[in-house]
């Protein structure tokens, strides 16, 4: 009989981490009969899945660990583990700073968690494994367990871009693609469990080049075509993309695959070619615009979101104005925007940066004001339209109100029977609010 363990997992960062955290629980459950808990004080295993994109990420992790340290006094068998990108960066240093930590594991070694726990219990020594064993983890992970009608599926790991500001190639390793048939099998398993929307994940997901059993290679467009043929899958998304690999094949898929959501997240990071060169993004603004123009020729009403960095070393007011001009021209929807965060070990960390923080904060506010204005206009334009909603559950504020998302990722709240949860429903949008929409079931 398997030993029962209560597991608490705190997830920081991107959708890839959310996917990894779900798989952590599944692999632990195979060995220990685990039960999820939302209270870390009640847990037998506490894991934090970390993100290192932003500045001071390490300190946030050690602050969280400090909250858990005292639990060892009342539960000497408690296992505390640190995973994710901070674990990859810091490795043994985590144990040196926090000797009470039992496990340190990278994104590519989550499948080894049960064995690491057993080794810790046997030797009473902290276990560290931050290696990059390519896609080995997918060979050893159990079948995925769906939670609701939406699911993430990781199709590749790592990144080869080495943008000058980014730590991902150092923490996630080089690009490694999951075999084509393996991805299809995982999607089919999820569809059998009632999943209707799949989000394909990768640090540079549109550079997917998956090996096929026939010896050929499948790109993302071909993968999407095959996933769309799986019975039950009715909506497909993918993230995160790079403009360089946003290929004509992928653009054409928007014409031939109706299951592809009418929304694209395509990080451009800046609107100035000079800044893009210093970021080592390997494309120009003109090339980005040309790809968007081709996409909108196929899907005129598609909404496009992005990621933006302001205050990159050497950014002038002229550079920043070019960013604002791009946001206006493309009409970017809900997007992520940040002040540049220096990451140790990256080339950009050595660039001279003499822009005052007050100026950077002002630029960020101006950018976010423009992005929010764009998003509100798009939301108001949806009032009176009929939208196909995938019903996620009930509203956070009212258990008698259903809540779901449109193709362009808007939250819609409306009255309806709870039997609709996990299903698609047609809803007429009646009101636009700052962070959501209201509607009526048709």
Curated annotation (Swiss-Prot):
InterPro entries: Elp3/MiaA/NifB-like_rSAM, Methylthiotransferase, Methylthiotransferase_CS, Methylthiotransferase_N, Methylthiotransferase_N_sf, MiaB_methiolase, rSAM, rSAM_horseshoe
MTTase N-terminal domain residues: 5-122
Catalytic activity: N(6)-dimethylallyladenosine(37) in tRNA + (sulfur carrier)-SH + AH2 + 2 S-adenosyl-L-methionine = 2-methylsulfanyl-N(6)-dimethylallyladenosine(37) in tRNA + (sulfur carrier)-H + 5'-deoxyadenosine + L-methionine + A + S-adenosyl-L-homocysteine + 2 H(+)
Binding site for [4Fe-4S] cluster 2: 159, 163, 166
EC number of this enzyme: 2.8.4.3
Keyword tags: 4Fe-4S, Cytoplasm, Iron, Iron-sulfur, Metal-binding, S-adenosyl-L-methionine, Transferase, tRNA processing
Enzyme class (EC, first level): transferase
Domain Radical SAM core intervals: 145-378
PROSITE patterns membership: MTTASE_N, MTTASE_RADICAL, RADICAL_SAM, TRAM
Name of the protein described by the UniProt record: tRNA-2-methylthio-N(6)-dimethylallyladenosine synthase
